[in-house]
């Protein structure tokens, strides 16, 4: 009853006059989807985090839902968290289109921009930043993110730093890369239990047909990028029968040996992200 009295049939104005209205259909659905997560978050924040004795950045992620986050759902979740005493630093909605691991944005750019603008308006009104998850390599939308937020955002990008490491391994230790590549393909189905990707292994050339000099270019192709991306945990944890690591130690020793190469690759890679976001 409290939620119905607070939202149902009500209209809320954002800072620029844009209105958000809750009707019976969309309201009941969003309560069913989000209320348990909201209650759990408020409990964790107030019982564990609030008393930790230091400043924290608190981010709420609602991007793992099956459908994009509507403006009404975004407003409802954030409003309820704030009423529950949660100080939100950033919130990650699920945007339209697909933010798959390791590759560029898939979807209609104009629709994304329209919906992103609305999410930013809500965040500015309620006092936190918008967060973009799986933000690595989403070059098509970076200019929109940088411009619309005026630099106030959180972009999660780390996974493709691993792919730059894989690129260095492919160039400097091709024998190790070949083993990693075959292992990744063999264990792809296990990794796909945790990540949604569109990679098609049949589009990846047979590695035994490639010369060593051709291996680094596999990190420029979407299918092989995604396969090596989502299997990183399996690759690093894999062990031999005697308990030694199958790949991990050699990966680290290779990267230590060619540390400057890896740094240069990261400077170029992250530089592309910063440039796309309008950061100079």
Predicted features along the sequence, with ranges:
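Catalytic alpha/beta active-site cores
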Residues: 1-31, 47-48
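Active-site capping/gating regions of soluble enzymes
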Residues: 33, 37, 42-52, 66-280
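Short Gly/Ser/Thr- and Asp/Glu-enriched loop/turn motifs at secondary-structure junctions
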Residues: 53-57
């Amino acid at each position: 009853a409290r939620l119905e009295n607070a939202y149902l049939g009500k209209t809320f104005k954002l800072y620029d006059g844009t209105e958000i209205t809750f009707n019976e259909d969309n309201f009941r659905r969003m309560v069913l989807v989000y209320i348990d997560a909201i209650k759990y978050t408020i409990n964790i924040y107030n019982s564990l985090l609030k008393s930790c004795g230091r400043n924290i950045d608190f981010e709420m992620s609602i991007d793992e839902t099956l459908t994009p986050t509507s403006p009404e759902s975004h407003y409802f979740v954030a409003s309820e968290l704030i009423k529950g005493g949660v100080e939100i630093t950033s919130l990650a909605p699920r945007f339209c289109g697909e933010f798959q691991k390791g590759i560029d944005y898939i979807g209609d750019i104009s629709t994304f921009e329209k919906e992103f603008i609305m999410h930013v308006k809500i965040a500015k009104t309620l006092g936190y930043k918008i967060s973009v998850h799986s933000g690595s390599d989403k070059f098509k939308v970076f200019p929109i993110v940088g411009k619309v937020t005026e630099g106030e955002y959180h972009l999660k990008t780390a996974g493709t730093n691993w792919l730059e490491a894989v690129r260095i391994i492919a160039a400097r230790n091709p024998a190790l890369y070949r083993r990693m590549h075959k292992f990744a393909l063999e264990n792809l189905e296990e990794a796909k239990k945790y990540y949604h990707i569109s990679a098609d292994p049949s589009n990846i050339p047979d590695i035994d047909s490639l010369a060593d000099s051709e291996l680094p270019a596999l990190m420029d192709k979407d299918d092989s990028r995604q396969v090596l991306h989502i299997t990183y945990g399996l690759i690093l944890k894999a062990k031999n029968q005697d308990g030694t690591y199958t790949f991990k130690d050699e990966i680290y020793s290779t990267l230590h040996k060619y540390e400057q190469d890896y740094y240069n690759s990261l400077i170029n890679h992250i530089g592309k992200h910063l440039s796309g976001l309008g950061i100079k």
